């Protein structure tokens, strides 16, 4: 909106620069989240929209009165900042906002069900995955119709591994959406544990998106160019800004939880960025914490069903370390460090090709 008004009509050149608009979006989203979150917390407490705490984690029972669904606020702030600072005529921008709002809506439905039932079950698995599947499929098909190429790239290699047939690419993208959104959802179990790794991953992906959308940088770095995708940089920075605003209230001890309203939206948007910037494989490294958390659940369930034995004291793995006696803050900060290092290694792939 501001972009169209100030650059399109008044020809204010500052607004033609992607980096300026992304920076402006960051601060708008940050301060808007900072302003709205206390009001949301008061409203949520009045409505008793508290996070149900699992009886299997007795050390977390002191969190039972903490309101949830804070993700609604940072998603809203991101959308407002994006509408103001991004070009709304760009399909990548529109699809990015659809992903954020759509995945957040599914998360909201799940959160609402948990609050009403006062347990952690939420929606049925069939309903939840069905909604996520349809949303992922629609966005993937639209990306295909947009003309996003279907080459599969591996990190540190300048040439693609191979070109996927369209139907295979769409199926693969749907898998990336579903796996990433649920991986972030599983990670969101301690104060700030999902927020900071999401920030690191989004910052890394935003750099890749910026390079992919810039003809000079993509040519110099031998990176696959994706026409018009650079505008997504604005939304990514806005989401990072809103996450910093959310973290202000979510750091230990948390005043609010993001809930599925936030974690599914984050995972969906991270997946979207990875797909449009051809980083589906590299996402495993950038989102290493999310991958490890998910694998710990898969291995735990698989081991128990096949051998009647548990590999971990509790899954996801952050609870395993809590059960071993690690303080919550120690688990959180160490996971942050791992996430930061994995993203720094991922960024090296930009130059090493």
Curated annotation (Swiss-Prot):
UniProt xrefs under InterPro entries: Glycosyl_transferase_4 (IPR000715), PNAcMuramoyl-5peptid_Trfase (IPR003524), PNAcMuramoyl-5peptid_Trfase_CS (IPR018480)
Cofactor(s) the protein needs: Mg(2+)
Lipid bilayer topology: Multi-pass membrane protein
GO BP field: cell division; cell wall organization; peptidoglycan biosynthetic process; regulation of cell shape
GO CC terms of this entry: plasma membrane
Top-level EC class as recorded in UniProt: transferase
Subcellular location as annotated: Cell inner membrane
Catalytic activity: UDP-N-acetyl-alpha-D-muramoyl-L-alanyl-gamma-D-glutamyl-meso-2,6-diaminopimeloyl-D-alanyl-D-alanine + di-trans,octa-cis-undecaprenyl phosphate = di-trans,octa-cis-undecaprenyl diphospho-N-acetyl-alpha-D-muramoyl-L-alanyl-D-glutamyl-meso-2,6-diaminopimeloyl-D-alanyl-D-alanine + UMP
Keywords: Cell cycle, Cell division, Cell inner membrane, Cell membrane, Cell shape, Cell wall biogenesis/degradation, Magnesium, Membrane, Metal-binding, Peptidoglycan synthesis, Transferase, Transmembrane, Transmembrane helix
EC number(s) stated in the UniProt entry for this protein: 2.7.8.13
Signal peptide feature range: none
Principal location listed in the UniProt entry: membrane
Coiled coil region boundaries: none
Membrane spanning residue stretches: 24-44, 66-86, 88-108, 129-149, 160-180, 192-212, 229-249, 256-276, 281-301, 330-350
One Gene Ontology term of the molecular function aspect: metal ion binding
Classification via PROSITE patterns: MRAY_1 (PS01347), MRAY_2 (PS01348)
HAMAP family given in the database record: MraY
Entry's family note: Belongs to the glycosyltransferase 4 family. MraY subfamily.
Protein role: Catalyzes the initial step of the lipid cycle reactions in the biosynthesis of the cell wall peptidoglycan: transfers peptidoglycan precursor phospho-MurNAc-pentapeptide from UDP-MurNAc-pentapeptide onto the lipid carrier undecaprenyl phosphate, yielding undecaprenyl-pyrophosphoryl-MurNAc-pentapeptide, known as lipid I.
Protein name as annotated: Phospho-N-acetylmuramoyl-pentapeptide-transferase
